[in-house]
Amino acid sequence: MTTRREGERRAGSDASGPVRFSDRVVLIFVDGLGVGDGGRDDPTRTYGGDLFDWLRSRASWQPIDASLGISGIPQSATGQTSLFTGRNAQAVLGHHSTGFPGPVLREMLREHSLLKTLIEHSRSAAFLNAFRPLFWELSEAKRWTLSASTVANLAADLPFFTLDDLASERSVYQDVTNGDLRRRGFDVPEWTPGHAGRVLARNVGRFDFTLFEYFKTDKAGHTQDRESCESVLQELDGFVRAYLEAVPPGTLTLLTSDHGNIEDLGTRSHTTNPVPLMAWGPGETDALAACADLTD
């Protein structure tokens, strides 16, 4: 694999080419989506769709453990590190850690990043989220202090996607509609959730493994505002449905989270609820059967 300075790396030209294996896996990581009790404080029951209404969802899914044997409320840094490495980050630290990974978790990601492991086994992989120009203005050292997904991608020495890639529909921004970018003054097209889902589907055929991260769920959950939470769930529902309608045959798609949040309007914090593991495509039954917690 060609190595260039991180500040010069762009994903649009480096990550193209045919997939060398027939099997493809896509992981849609949704921050802060737990399996609630279905009560009046649970917007997954009232948002107007059924994909994330666990009592009515026709998707193949099961709850998995996000606590990993550690007491307290699960948090982002440890949950995501466990998810992206397959190792129990909570047990390594002895507690749940919020925000971005600290030195110990960064080292775990540096050594055991799923993306890095795939590359070492001659598989193609991509973290398909588009990044704002500010990312390339940061020093390399600063980039290593960002989110677990960013560190996992850095550990694999994979390129990052730009807003030019977004405009060319080679990547998707984290909010899927580009509304956040437009409010910041960037000249990017406004997308519907359905259009963004179809863009993701068109691109996953280029890689053996694709990661996409959506975190508006966690932000909405912290507001405890029903209207905001229901709107985000509607958006995510439309995005995932459109993606599933357009995804290439032979693709196994997984959707999961790092901890609960949006499913309980009664608290501003995260929850101790299990998180969903949803699966579509060849091998979905085996994938669900093999997973009991974030490390699986």
PLM features per residue range, with description:
Residues 2-296:
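Feature captures the catalytic ectodomains and active-site-proximal regions of enzymes
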